[in-house]
Amino acid sequence: MPRFKKGRDLNHWKTNRPDSDVGKLRIVGGVYGGRQIGYSGDPVTRPMKDDIREAVFNLVGGWTPGKIVFDLFAGTGAMGLEAISRGATKCFFVERHFPTVKIIRENVQTLDPDMNASVDASDSFFWCRKFLKDPASWPTEPWLVFFCPPYGLYVKSKDELLELIEKFKDAAPDESLIVVESDKRLDVSSLPDHESWEVRTYSPAVVSIFKKF
């Protein structure tokens, strides 16, 4: 069985930072910590809340430096930007919603015009299939892969998502991490090699983490 743990009360992670402004999110740690990034406010992007993102990076942050990041179904791009802030060397952002892609590109330019980032306006399923078919293009450094799709896809496209997660798990180099954000509609025991995942609940979010050794 997956290792279930209730996420620590989010009040534990809260500091005296004011809440993010409407239309803004905040990088919570690393070299860009405290800086705001743009957010359209469109619920289609459903960004992970600052406090949940902080809790997640308290779990994986020590593994982040030197990683190649894949922020799939990127939405606001906050996960990838947070990872870059905490020492990841490059991020591939993949998001199909064109207005949001524009905001991700603006956020990259605002934080660091020289950031090592690739922002692709593409369907994540299509992009991943193309990427996975070309092993010569795979980075050899360990990966940090974020799967944070709209929760409804775990119902509408469950099998396709699980297949994609499994393929990334198999393709990733040793020392890689995979982070899957879902809600309770995903039975985490259906994740590939499900006994190896650590699962935390930050209601309504369920965060599952796989470390490849």
Please report, for each region that a protein language model flagged, where it lies by residue.
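Class I S-adenosyl-L-methionine-dependent methyltransferase catalytic core
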Residues: 1-213
